[in-house]
């Protein structure tokens, strides 16, 4: 084998390893550090392949976490987006995140799902704020007192991880008004 072939083959292998390392989302971490109304410590990658750990990496003082469990629930998530985008404009200390929550799975499956979502979501803000969690869903649901996966769950969380408000299901004016009242009360 010529030296040139060895160099080219080595470059291809190293390039492939780097590419896989760059796009493969790691398994999420889950730690329940406090009982009561606190968001557990979780890690995941957004659709721009950046790793986050929450609550440490919450960007603002008040963070709305929207948790869907099934792909079809994206339609329910979408009912909230216009309202939470308006709330974000009205209250600079507020931001929202989507955290699709999926069972732990092999690396190729995680890559396939994340890259599929990435391809289907061209909006840069949505990519930045969609952090997929691959973890033990039973422990996650137990920590957040989520009884089932039949609907989406929303949590208003401060930087310390304290849950200030929670709701279930599609947007309604009543739920949004309640959220705004809580935001006003803690500001």
Sequence positions of predicted segments:
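N-terminal targeting signals for export/organelle localization
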Residues: 1-38
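N-terminal "domain-start" segment that seeds a small globular fold
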Residues: 27-54, 79
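Short active-site neighborhood of thiol/selenol oxidoreductases, capturing the structured segment around
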Residues: 54-79, 96
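Loop/turn elements at helix/coil->beta-strand transitions in domains of secreted/extracellular proteins
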Residues: 60-62, 92-95, 151, 159-160
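Solvent-exposed loop/turn segments at secondary-structure junctions
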Residues: 71-73, 102-106, 137-139, 162-163, ...
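Structural microenvironment flanking redox-active thiols in thiol-disulfide oxidoreductases
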Residues: 73-123
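Short, internal strand/loop/helix patches
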Residues: 97-99, 111-149
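Thiol-/selenol-based redox modules, centered on thioredoxin-like
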Residues: 141-143, 149-187
